[in-house]
Swiss-Prot record:
Tissues expressed in: Predominantly expressed in body wall muscle and heart, low in intestine, ovary and larval tail muscle.
GO molecular function, one term: actin filament binding
Region described as Disordered: 18-38
Name of the featured protein: Tropomyosin, smooth muscle/fibroblast CTM1
Top-level taxon: Eukaryota
Coiled coil region boundaries: 1-284
PANTHER family named among the record's database cross-references: TROPOMYOSIN
Gene: CTM1
GO biological process, one term: actin filament organization
């Protein structure tokens, strides 16, 4: 009887321990599930940030390509502007040379005009003096007058050419100034684009480093989630085993309680028989 009680007590303790282990396993399971859920949420957040980083990286790469294209266009425009400036410089050189030649011709024409005017003045004075000279002298005077007219025409033509060359020179100088302004603007734009390109490149490097960091952290979280999943499975297995142990212990306890009840019934029956026997002996 004592052995049965002792065994029942031990079974009850085993049952309580099994229940405690099952509850602890359930607690561990819930804690692991909560932690896994938290890690999954954090992983999802990291994946979202990584996706945003990748989108920002794509945007930065697109900006970088655009900046490179703009820089190439600016360099091409600057090269075109430099070629245009060089062409204008050549044209200015040619115009200056033509202007120098025109000035030389003008100087010669003015000199001839001055000589012709002097000759005309002398001729005029001489004409008054020698009005009555021979026809030959009159012809010489006519020739000198013709030479004077030609000299005046040459001087007027030189003046017109000088004015035209000066006008062309002003136009070319204006075109040169505009070309230089465009070249300066293109150089300034190229410098701005180079600075923007440097900034974009630095941002790109920073984004690539962030992407690598997030990727490494994602791997760590995935490994930790795997570990927790394994622990969760182990906890579930232990909980299942504990539940089975509890069921088995409860079954054993029920069987022992039935046995105890049967023994009590037997003892009661024996006690009743003993009472009847003792009463019969007393009646004798």
């Amino acid at each position: 009887m004592e052995a049965i009680k002792k065994k029942m007590t031990m079974l009850k303790l085993d049952k309580e321990n099994a229940i405690d282990r099952a509850e602890q396993a359930e607690t561990d399971k819930k804690s692991a599930e909560d932690k896994a859920t938290g890690l999954e949420e954090e992983l999802q957040g990291l994946q979202k940030r990584l996706k945003a980083t990748e989108d920002e990286l794509d945007t930065s790469q697109e900006k970088l390509r655009t900046a490179i294209e703009n820089l190439e266009n600016a360099e091409k425009k600057a090269a075109d502007a430099e070629q245009e400036v060089a062409s204008l410089n050549r044209r200015i050189t040619l115009v200056e040379e033509e202007l120098d030649r025109a000035q030389e011709r003008l100087t010669i024409s003015l000199s001839k005009l001055e000589e012709a005017e002097k000759a005309a003045d002398e001729s005029e004075r001489g004409r008054k003096v020698i009005e009555n000279r021979s026809l030959k002298d009159e012809e010489r005077l006519e020739v000198q007058e013709i030479q004077l007219t030609e000299a005046k025409n040459i001087a007027e033509d030189a003046d017109r050419k000088y004015v035209e060359v000066a006008r062309k020179l002003v136009m070319v100088e204006a075109e040169l100034e505009r070309g230089e302004e465009r070249a300066e603007l293109a150089e300034s734009k190229a410098i701005e684009l180079e600075e923007e390109l440097k900034i974009v490149a630095n941002n790109l490097k920073s984004l690539e480093a962030s992407a690598e960091k997030y990727a490494a952290k994602e791997g760590i979280f995935e490994e930790e989630i795997k570990t927790l999943s394994d622990k969760l499975k182990d906890s579930e297995t232990r909980a299942e085993f504990a539940e089975k142990s509890v069921v088995k212990l409860e079954k054993n306890i029920d069987e022992l309680e039935d046995s105890l009840y049967a023994e009590k019934c037997k003892i009661k029956a024996i006690s009743e028989d003993m009472d009847v026997t003792l009463q019969g002996i007393g009646d004798l």
